[in-house]
Every structure is written in structure tokens, then in C-alpha cells.
Amino acid sequence: MSSQSPAEGLQFPIHASIKKQSTSLTGQEILSEALSIVDNKTAQQILAEKNWRKNYPIYFKALVKHGITNSNNPITIAKQGLHKAHHLFDYYRDGKHYLLKDALHIPTSTPLNTVKFKGESEAAPEWYVPYKGQKLSGQSLLDQIQKWENAGIIEPSHAKALREAAAHPEWFDLSDRTMVLFGAASEAGPLPWLARWKANIVAIDLPNPRVWGKILNTIQQGNATLIAPSIEKIDSSAKASALRDKLGANLLTQIPEIAQWLVQFPQKLDLAAIAYLDGEKHVRVSMAMDSIMQYVSEHKPDTSLMFMCTPTDVYAVPKEVAEAAQEKFKSRSQLQKMAVKGVSTLSLKRFFQAPYQDLITSENGKTYGIADCLVVEQGPNYALAKRIQQWRATLARHQGQRVSINIG
């Protein structure tokens, strides 16, 4: 990626050595800084890496490995990585250049206005699990949970959480929660569920009639309340058809406006980082969300954070999970082994490798495996965007905030 004259908003930095933007160099600098204290040798290797787009998984796995060995390492890694990122990315406003870390303090000439829109449904909040065309709830859900657990499809802790949710339908009345959705219209986001659970939904997404038509339609059919930003003052009686052209805020260009708008809310806020963009924009929008989350958390310490991580990443898992996966791998039928061997050979041994090949003992006395599910073809930008979110989650939890991570 290169650019002669950076556009407005959050941008990758221009590197002095090549006099242009480089997503690879930026990623290498951030990961190197993240590892610099816990493993300086690998940190230097990252900076010297000549084939970053192919070899980046090695270094993302190193982050996890060092995070396992010592309970202080994940905090150190997260602090170092985020600090570097906030001092590296640029922000442009009216032709002036700022470091991202300073963007939140830019005076806003056009503050955002608040628009509310209530859903028309009177239905009570309801939760079920969609499965094979059915909506499982009650005893049918409990029976299916038991089948999944018996078959090893879900872990016991997962089964326990589902049973608890089924036993407490009152949990799904969210009329006392104010939930901020960055990238509210995201296909993988929780908007359709929250719209049925009486939540107060602060929706942030691009000013785009198609996007807001979708959001407004979802809210209108549910029992929730939409709270949306607008640069215009809008009459409270405005209908959905009129609102769709007037709502929205851009996470990449309106960072200070969004952050300063959110801290004005008197309610506790639950911030959900679910915005997704393709390629290098995904890193930028992750950094934008991180900047806003950090700012809001500093001004409202009772704020909670939520992230949607990806299964195609690297994670530490308990020893029991790793050993169960190893046992299943060993107990495959002969036909399965032959088929897998063929695919593995054709893919130059990139697919269907034995899981959790190494178990690592931490200084806390526990043993962990590493679930290495990175897909090289997704690229280092995607991996970095997701790592930024994990770092913020790790650091926020360490600092006493409530944090939720879902992988899916």
C-alpha cells in the first residue's frame, strides 16, 4: 500500500526509509515492540524479516508462547504493542498531521447530535439456539446440549454456560443496559438479537442510507431503543424513511467526535468492537475502535468491553483440551488417515497437521497447548487487527474492567 498525499482521518504512517506507507513495516514494528522486553532476540528478527507476508505466523505464535510461560508477559506484550501502535499511526484533520495518540484531543467543530428511535414490538425477550432449521429452547435445547457434550462437540464449561442461560430467561431483558456497537450493521454482529431483548443500542456505522435502512428496519421490528449519531439536529418525531439519510459517523475520520459524544452518556456503557473492513482498512478501523475504547474507559471506568475474535488465529488452550484433540487425532480411522495424508502432501504439509504438538508449562504450574489456526492466506493485516483487539481485552481485564471475548 502506498500513498503520495494521505487522506483525512486515520492512516498508516509514512516510513522515512521508503518515503511511503507500508503495512508490512508497520506490522513488523508493532510486533517487534510487543516482544522487545520478553524476547529481544525474536523482536530483532521480526525487524529483519524479509518475507513478512509468508512468515508472519511464526511471530504471532511467539507472542502466544511467551504469554503462556509467565503470567506477567501477556500484560507486558499488550502494553508494549498498543503503546507502539498509538505512537505510530497517523491522523489527519483539515490538512494537519497528528499522531493517533493525540487525535482524541482535537477540538471538534461539528459535535454529534443524538437521535432516538424505538422499536414497535411488544414481545417479551426470548432466547433460543438455531439448529438445523429449528429454534431450540426448553427441554429440547437441554437434550441437544447433552448430546453435544457427550459427543465432545462442546466442552463441559460451554455446556454449563448454555444450561445457565436456559435457566435464566430474565437475563435477556437488557432494558437496563446501554450497548455501543461499533460497526452496528456487521453481518456477524449481535444487532438482531439485541433488538429483541429491549436493549438500548448506540449504533455507530457509516453514514450510508443502505446501512441505516438495515439498522432501522431491524430496530423497528424489535422491542429495543436505537440511539444514533447525526451531524444534524433531527426532530424526535422523524420516521425511519427520513432518518436513513441523516444518521451515522465514520470511525476512520470522526474519532474525536465519536469519543467525545460517547463520554457524555450518563449510563454505563458496554462497548462492542465488531466493525470489519477488508485488507489494511481492517487494521485502521481496529485502531480507531481501540482509541475510542481507551478514551471512553479512561473517562468512564465502569465501561465494559466486548470483542469478536476469529477462529483462524493462535490461542493458548488448557492441557485437557489439547490432550483431547491429540487423542482424537490419533484415533482416526485408516481411511481418514489416508485422506488427510493426501491433502497434507498436496498442500506442502500446510493442512491437517497434528494439533497441539507442543505443551508448555507456565510458571503458575499449569500446562497449556497452542491452538495454531492461522491461515497464511488471510495475511498479516488481518492477524494484526485481531491481535490489537486481544491486547486491549487483556489489558482492560488486568485493569479491572469487565471484558467479553467471543470467537466465531
Map each language-model feature to its residues.
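Non-catalytic protein-protein interaction scaffold segments in large eukaryotic complex-forming proteins
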Residues: M1-H66
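Extended charged low-complexity segments that act as oligomerization/scaffolding linkers
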Residues: S2-Q4, W212-F265
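Low-complexity, highly charged intrinsically disordered N-terminal segments
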Residues: Q44-S157
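A short, basic/flexible loop-to-alpha-helix module at the beginning of a structural domain
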Residues: P156-S175
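Glycine-rich adenosine-cofactor-binding loop
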Residues: D176-L191, A195, V202-D205
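Structural alpha-beta junctions
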Residues: K198-A203, Q220-T225, Q264, D290-F307, ...
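Extended alpha-helical scaffolding regions
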Residues: L243-D245, A249-V317
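Long, contiguous domain-sized segments
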Residues: M306-G408
